[in-house]
Amino acid sequence: IQMNMQEMATAVVSKLPVKIIILNNRFHGMVRQWQDLFYNGRYASSDLENTPDFVKLAEAYGAVGLRANTMDDLDGVLKKAIETEGPVIVDVPTYRFENCYPMIPAGGCNHEMILEDPPELKQKQAGGTKVTPQDKDTVLTA
């Protein structure tokens, strides 16, 4: 979202009923996932520990900002977002190293789709992935 946040201004001015749900892992998530899968976890410009407060950012644009702080909050927050007129940003904190599947590797075909973490990545994550204090407060995990 940070690569095209300026579009929120257009959504507000045009009163578009756009609902944006940010699965916020404080990374450029897909970039980090590629760096894990294809570059042995060598992160370059993907770790965003100092992400903005997306609720305040939405409000700065004149939109509505919501956050689901727990799994119990999620249904109510999503319902409120849908019922709200105009643009809404919903911030959903997630585990920093959660991956998003399915995905197709660069230059790959549909039959080469990756459906889950490969065993070596699962083992690496189970054996010592750094969990930050913020991760203990996340709402969505595998």
Model-derived features: positions:
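Thiamine diphosphate
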Residues: 1-142
